[in-house]
Amino acid sequence: MISVTDIRRAFLDNECHTITKAFGYLHEDNAIALIKIGFHPTYLPKVLYNNVVEFVPEKLYLFKPRTVAPLDLISTITKLKNVDKFASHINYHKNSILITGDKSLIVKCMPYMIISDDDIRFIREQFVGTNSIEYILSFINKESIYRMSYQFSENEIVTIINRDHFMYEPIYEHQVLDSDFLKTMLDRYGIVPINSGIIDELCPEAIIEILMAVVRPRDAIRFLDIVNKNQLTEDSVKNYIINDIRRGKIDYYIPYVEDFLEDRTEDLGIYANIFFEDAIDITKLDITKTELEHISKYMNYYTTYIDHIVNIILQNNYIDILASIIDYVQDVLTEELCIRIVCESTNPVPVTSLPIHSTLVMVMCIQMKYVDIVEFLDEIDIDTLIEKGADPITEYTFTTRWYNKHNDLITLYIKKYGFCPMMMKRLMFEYPLTKEASDHLLKTMDENRGAIMFFPRTICTLPYLLCCNYKLIQKPIPFKEENRNIVYKKNNRVLCFDSLENSAFKSLIKIDSIPGLKTYNMKDITYEKSNNIICVRFIPQESIHNEERRIKLQLFDIARLASYGLYYIPSRYLSSWTPVVNMIEGREYTNPQKIECLVILDLFSEEFIEYQNLGNAVSNKYELEYTISNYQAAINCLMSTLLIYLVLGSIRSISKTEDFVLSILNIFYKGLKINELLSEPVSGVCIELNKIKDRASSGDSSFIFLKKNELSKTLSLCEKVCVETILDNNQSFKSSK
């Protein structure tokens, strides 16, 4: 349980109405300790500034921009890859950043700064060369474009749009463009020429051709606004638009129809009532299912005929359409119809739109995995919800007032997340708790210290263990005496590094000292310094030609290196997958969407990071919003690596899949020097891996996309292995299981 004793005391002693207010009364040391673990309000008092600068500078965004010193800001954001949370601070200190920052820092900050014409002139003077200014300007934001008079070249426009497609809108509004360029951009990128440069090229045929390319209602409306009215009255244009409306593109043409089609209501058919009040008696029409689907979004224009529409829907069993207009048909909904809507409609309906909140309806919503089950609390007590298997605590619940209405819901939240700084921060500092709800929350947490509320299941889950202050043991690397009496052949290799402090060089030297590695492709390493360059000579290891054996031994090396505090980051395979971040934020995670490479490649020293630097390295590699701990980063590395070697290894394996999986797990444990035996069957994992293997074998792609939850069993296995790794590294905790 997160300790809130000091916060509770401050809350009571100072008669605070919010927990945020109470946080401001904490002793600085206590406040900083909580800030370090990510448990803090959305803003901090000035009195904590110096301590935050010293101990957790990445949290400077919690102060108002004017409170943050420019040099402190620049020093901090220079080290971070993801600076989204510093957006207002970056813009506030724009001048200091432009004057002080180098090219890479300015590029990093460009999306957040409101750039003026004077700023562009300054950047041109600072960074001479067309390519430099074009590259820097490619990161500009739309707010800057709306405020400047600078005219972008066609090359600059293409560069900007290649980086962010939707930047076409402010650019096209900003300046008149050549018609040939506009046509090229339409053909190449599908960008509608909403620019006065195209006006002289327009004719009815061209207007229709452009409308055929439109995919956003806003673009259609804005394009028609610049067209000459005489051309908009052409019959060919009118006929095309009427047909487009009948195809369901209603939002695209609402202003146009009201101005130009008042005399064509008969041609509009059932859709006429959307634009003109009760223009058509729809009871005289033969209404199709497609038409009902199209008009369901606009049911407020058909209230006169709602009974007629409902009769058609029920006669034809169009449950999906009934669900889409549920707010207009409350009087006809029985319990049976509510259940049918819940079970048969493609898209979930809001529970608040279901007029009957019976236990049976609730059970159906649970089975269909509705996220707003909490709304049944207006009729059903929380114990019944839990008994039926409901989880009323979801992302949706934060959008409601239920936490202030039900103290039992807060207690349930604490049982689920009381160990998680991120999730408790959301409820305590970001949700508008009343004074009474805040008091109940603090009292419950303070009176249930330790892990008492999390026994017996939660304490052995990976999300719980990741939020606890555990560590992974790093065995000391044995000293290896350097041997300089090595005879190198002409075909032996040389690597060069810029300094002895280069992280890849330091990893290489440490790796060379670790005994028992099987596949690391460098042996007999020596190095010398020459002209400020570190030259490393080595003899390549002999290749292992049996692919399956190579993969297994390579995983052993990765695990063995981890046991000595050198962790492998598999970003070449998984470029954006960080399951640990989801877990410490209390969110569900699924398998990665894509594996970038289907071949297990050789290992290189620069891919291994020392444990004490791992949190920063992983956070920057994946451009996270905050820095995770070394411990959390290590588990992310282990889990990602194990997943990759299971999936890609099984694709290459010629063994029976079950034998391969068990062998991989044994090798992984052996490399980590963990004495564990998997007691659970892996048949479900094998089924998933075999499906991936079949798919990969049938194609010739160098990568593979994964469907959501396609590897759920495999991920569960990886989680269990990580849990065992943590428990083995923290034996005192393991003994209390």
Swiss-Prot record:
One Pfam match: Pox_E2-like
Entry keywords, A to Z: Acetylation, Disulfide bond, Early protein
Modification after translation (UniProt): N-acetylated on initiator methionine by host.
N-acetylmethionine: residues bearing it: 1
Cysteine pairs bridged by disulfides in the record: 496-535
This protein's name: Protein OPG064
Subunit structure of this chain's protein: Interacts with host KLC2; this interaction promotes IEV trafficking by engaging the host kinesin-1 complex. Interacts with protein OPG056.
Family according to the record: Belongs to the orthopoxvirus OPG064 family.
Superkingdom of this protein's organism: Viruses
Functional note: Plays a role in intracellular enveloped virus (IEV) transport to the cell surface on microtubules. Together with protein OPG056, forms a complex that interacts with host KLC2 (kinesin light chain isoform 2) to engage the kinesin-1 complex and thereby promote IEV trafficking.
InterPro entries assigned: Poxvirus_E2, Poxvirus_E2/O1
Induction: Expressed in the early phase of the viral replicative cycle.
